[in-house]
């Protein structure tokens, strides 16, 4: 039915928003402000907005209405977008379940799988990492309160998990291993293929939170033996409020839904699918499929430039994470500088001291502490996010302003003065 409706979404009279929002204007910094916080969100690509707007005005039908043209048009558009998203990760379109975002997808994966086991009266054990996103860790803590056993594995000082630790942690009642593709704070890329192979050999489901990985690094769920994968649109230059969970069909992943209702999305996520958001997600995925390699090389070049400028001009600077991590996430510790103070000195630059979900907390980053960083170093860290629309001249501005701010703040630090005078702080006996 859907194949015969492709013509329904051909609308020659639809508005062309690109004439109102050209790409250079959409990403204009206004000459002052610079956005380097792409791990928290990304600007909507103007081509994505072009694709979305007609579905707010002309093609506004409910995609679940099967009795008239408005519904057929919306349904055809949703299914096209489902195919675009599926193509990005190498799966069947029927394996894509649309959600409100990666947080919901993660909740559905963890609670859905463990909930099915508990419903059968069986014990459930989940394995994850100490450095996972807060929505994974909080969901696991919630599951622990409901009888699910959870193992939180440590990582190395580069943020990468030891495969042997995963292997040793798998037990008879282990139902799921949940390990993120790319860490949102330090950009560490986990060995998904090796983990997936291990899980397949041991008969355990493998879930990955790929919100920071999809569209940025190559991910193929079949090659990597991934059974469940969470993603969202607003991390790949699409709209906020829409995400997806890939759920393998063969062999079938058994799970219970979080939301009951009309039985949409294979009964796993009831509720009317927001066709404008889904269309935007699909277009963003299509662009990533075509331009991922170019984006990666652009980001890699700017990342190298930023790191080199810091290393050349700031004494003792520490780049956190793995050298083989995603280059667009540059987490830097500036010893003897308070991270929050540095952010205040760089108020015209959008940066973060950690995940957007935890950056309001004054606690040092739990991710950096898991890497073995002490509280002082963790407090001195800033994340620089480089994306598709970041320009080389912006990197120059950011690097120069950061160097200047670090030098000013260090001049006010008595500890830094002591270090410059050759005093070994570790040998000082501090009194309270």
Curated annotation (Swiss-Prot):
Q: Which residues cross the membrane?
A: none
| Cofactor(s) the protein needs | pyridoxal 5'-phosphate
| Residues the entry annotates as binding pyridoxal 5'-phosphate | 102-103, 212, 232-234, 272
Q: Which family does it belong to?
A: Belongs to the class-V pyridoxal-phosphate-dependent aminotransferase family. NifS/IscS subfamily.
Which GO molecular-function terms appear in the entry?
cysteine desulfurase activity; iron-sulfur cluster binding; metal ion binding; pyridoxal phosphate binding
Species source reads Encephalitozoon cuniculi (strain GB-M1)
Q: Which EC number(s) does UniProt give?
A: 2.8.1.7
Protein name according to UniProt = Cysteine desulfurase, mitosomal
Taxonomy of the source species = Eukaryota, Fungi, Fungi incertae sedis, Microsporidia, Unikaryonidae
């Amino acid at each position: 039915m859907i194949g015969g409706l492709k013509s329904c979404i051909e609308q020659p009279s639809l508005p062309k928003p690109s004439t109102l929002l050209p790409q250079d204007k959409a990403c204009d910094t206004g000459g002052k402000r610079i956005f380097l916080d792409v791990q928290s969100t990304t600007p909507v690509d103007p081509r994505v907005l072009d694709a979305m707007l007609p579905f707010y005005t002309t093609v506004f039908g409910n995609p679940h209405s099967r009795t008239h043209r408005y519904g057929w048009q919306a349904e055809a558009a949703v299914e096209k977008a489902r195919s675009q998203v599926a193509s990005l990760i190498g799966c069947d379109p029927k394996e894509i379940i649309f959600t409100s975002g990666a947080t919901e997808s993660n909740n559905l994966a963890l609670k859905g799988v463990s909930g099915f086991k508990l419903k059968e009266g069986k014990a459930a054990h989940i394995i994850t990492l100490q450095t996972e996103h807060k929505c994974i860790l909080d969901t696991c803590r919630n599951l622990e309160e409901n009888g699910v056993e959870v193992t939180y594995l440590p990582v190395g000082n580069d943020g990468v998990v030891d495969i042997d630790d995963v292997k040793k942690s798998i037990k008879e009642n282990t139902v799921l291993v949940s390990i993120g593709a790319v860490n949102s704070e330090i950009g560490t890329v986990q060995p998904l293929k090796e983990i997936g192979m291990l899980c397949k050999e041991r008969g355990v489901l493998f879930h990955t939170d790929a919100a920071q990985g999809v569209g940025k690094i190559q991910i193929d769920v079949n090659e990597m033996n991934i059974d469940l994968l969470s993603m969202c649109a607003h991390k790949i230059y699409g709209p906020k409020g829409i995400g997806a969970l890939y759920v393998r069909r063969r062999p079938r992943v058994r799970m219970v839904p979080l939301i009951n209702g009309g039985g949409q999305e294979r009964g796993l996520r009831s509720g009317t699918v927001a066709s404008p958001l889904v269309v935007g997600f699909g277009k963003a995925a299509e662009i990533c499929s075509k331009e991922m390699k170019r984006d990666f090389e652009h980001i890699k070049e700017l990342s190298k430039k930023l790191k080199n400028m810091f290393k050349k001009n700031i004494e003792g600077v520490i780049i956190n994470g793995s050298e083989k991590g995603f280059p667009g996430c540059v987490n830097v510790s500036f010893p003897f500088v308070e991270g929050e103070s540095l952010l205040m000195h760089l108020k015209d630059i959008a940066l973060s001291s950690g995940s957007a979900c935890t950056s309001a907390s004054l606690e040092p980053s739990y991710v950096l502490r898991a890497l073995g960083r002490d509280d002082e170093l963790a407090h001195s860290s800033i994340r620089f996010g480089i994306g598709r629309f970041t320009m080389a001249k912006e990197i120059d501005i950011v690097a120069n302003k950061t160097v200047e701010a670090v030098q000013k703040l260090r001049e006010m630090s008595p500890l830094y003065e002591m270090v410059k005078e050759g005093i070994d702080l570790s040998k000082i006996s501090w009194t309270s």
